[in-house]
């Protein structure tokens, strides 16, 4: 079955996480992604957090499925010729270099347009134009500057970064959408364009409800926040709210049976107004359905600590899965805190392709996250990540149509890596 992006060729000049997240998603959808890597070392993540000796790390393999790898020294004159040929033959170039790197390599936007006016150049930067645009950004820096850290954690504690990679992977996902949009636009315009996503912007986009709350503060306290019920005044910025729900429906993480020894024996429980009476019945407080102190959402807001304390008394008598089984038939929204071990052992996730087992020639089998986006007519298969330079000759011959003598000249120039010494 043909894939959605069959026929789209992508020159992948990305490394670490943000860019590879983008290009891997496009590869899953069928694009031919050619990953350009530095001879000898390749993407730095090949050797980072290595768990199996002499094998690519999971950090690399889980972000570079379905790609081809070519090693290339772009500073070498022959290497620059190869790169120019790749630019001519590709539809998209994706890069997440520091600002100015492509220009210094001789591939400014103006020069790229001369080489291939239909090429889409997609870039990830830390910040957009402004006082910080030349600063280097990593995952946690993006979270801190994009509004996530200042609004995550508890009111009386430090700002916190989230375990989800919203800065790196979140930006990569935004860029993938931008690339597909630019490809569609090209069908009308016939021209390439630049697509740029800043990590700060991506994090802020995912924190839009906190910007919503920032503006609501001008009109009074945020009544769904715990501190309102505790009588604590609000400041002039959106506060950290612990595990309060961000959608206007009060919610908390509550202890379940076994919490004393199991760090994940918890459940997230939402006191949605539509099912309040069912909640009262489930926890054994039927009088709360008519008591004016509890019956209406507005009356409950100053009493959320008391209410969730009572619900927790009930959840502590059940496992998190028992709570789910009891609440789901009543449409009471709740969800267990699942550990990565529990998720990795969930067979239903393998059935849907959300988790996949991948075999690798040097590290053996490992579990990876598959494509979270399911297309009915373009199912994604997950193939292993490439070894360093595995497809170099294939790309030179089959994609760029270089002759054997041309490939030999390129190799002997050192553009593909260290030149083997002649036998004595």
Curated annotation (Swiss-Prot):
Catalytic activity, reaction form: formyl-CoA + oxalate = oxalyl-CoA + formate
Alphabetically ordered keywords of this record: Transferase
Any Gene Ontology biological process: oxalate catabolic process
Documented EC number(s): 2.8.3.16
Functional pathway: Metabolic intermediate degradation; oxalate degradation; CO(2) and formate from oxalate: step 1/2
InterPro entries: CoA-transferase_III_domain, CoA-Trfase_fam_III, CoA-Trfase_III_dom3_sf, CoA-Trfase_III_dom_1_sf, Formyl_CoA_transfer
Residues involved in CoA binding: 17-18, 38, 96-98, 104, 136-139
GO molecular function: formyl-CoA transferase activity
Tree of life domain: Bacteria
Amino-acid positions noted as binding substrate in the UniProt annotation, renumbered to this chain: 247-249
Transmembrane segments: none
Subunit structure: Homodimer.
Family: Belongs to the CoA-transferase III family. Frc subfamily.
Cross-referenced HAMAP family: Formyl_CoA_transfer
Function as written in the Swiss-Prot or TrEMBL entry: Involved in the catabolism of oxalate and in the adapatation to low pH via the induction of the oxalate-dependent acid tolerance response (ATR). Catalyzes the transfer of the CoA moiety from formyl-CoA to oxalate.
NCBIfam families hit by this protein: oxalate_frc (TIGR03253), PRK05398.1 (NF003809)
Protein name: Formyl-CoA:oxalate CoA-transferase
Phylogenetic lineage: Bacteria, Pseudomonadati, Pseudomonadota, Alphaproteobacteria, Hyphomicrobiales
């Amino acid at each position: 079955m043909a894939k959605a992006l069959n026929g789209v060729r992508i020159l992948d000049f990305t490394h670490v996480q943000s860019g590879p997240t983008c290009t891997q998603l496009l590869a899953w959808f069928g694009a031919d992604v050619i990953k350009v890597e530095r001879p000898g070392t390749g993407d730095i993540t090949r050797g980072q957090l290595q768990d199996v000796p002499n094998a690519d790390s999971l950090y690399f393999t889980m972000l570079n499925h379905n790609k081809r790898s070519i090693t290339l020294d772009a500073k070498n004159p022959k290497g620059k010729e190869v790169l120019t040929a790749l630019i001519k033959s590709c539809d998209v170039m994706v890069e997440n270099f520091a600002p100015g790197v492509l220009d210094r390599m001789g591939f400014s936007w103006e020069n790229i347009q001369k080489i291939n006016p239909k090429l889409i150049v997609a870039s990830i930067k830390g910040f957009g134009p402004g006082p910080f645009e030349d600063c280097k950004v990593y995952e946690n820096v993006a979270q801190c500057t994009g509004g996530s850290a200042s609004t995550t954690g508890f009111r009386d504690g430090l700002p916190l970064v989230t375990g989800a990679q919203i800065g790196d992977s979140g930006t990569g996902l935004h860029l993938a959408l931008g690339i597909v949009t630019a490809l569609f636009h090209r069908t009308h315009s016939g021209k390439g364009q630049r697509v740029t996503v800043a990590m700060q912007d991506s994090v802020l986009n995912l924190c839009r409800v906190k910007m919503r709350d920032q503006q609501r503060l001008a009109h009074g306290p945020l009544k769904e926040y715990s501190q309102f019920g505790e009588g604590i005044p609000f400041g002039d910025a959106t506060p950290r709210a612990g595990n309060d729900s961000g959608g206007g429906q009060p919610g908390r993480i509550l202890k379940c049976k076994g919490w004393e020894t199991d760090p994940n024996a918890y459940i997230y429980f939402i006191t949605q107004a539509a099912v309040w009476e069912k909640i009262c019945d489930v926890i054994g407080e039927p009088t709360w359905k008519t008591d004016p102190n509890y019956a209406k959402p507005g009356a409950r807001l100053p009493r959320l600590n008391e209410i969730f304390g009572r619900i927790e008394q009930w959840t502590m008598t059940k496992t998190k899965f028992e709570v789910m089984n009891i609440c789901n038939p009543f449409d009471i929204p709740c969800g267990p805190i699942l550990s990565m071990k529990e998720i990795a052992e969930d067979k239903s996730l393998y059935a849907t392709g959300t988790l996949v087992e991948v075999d690798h020639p040097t590290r053996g089998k490992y579990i990876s996250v598959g494509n979270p986006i399911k297309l009915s007519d373009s199912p994604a298969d997950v193939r292993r990540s490439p070894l360093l330079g595995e497809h170099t000759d294939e790309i030179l011959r089959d994609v760029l149509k270089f002759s054997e003598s041309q490939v030999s000249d390129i190799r002997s120039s050192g553009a593909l890596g260290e030149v083997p010494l002649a036998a004595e």
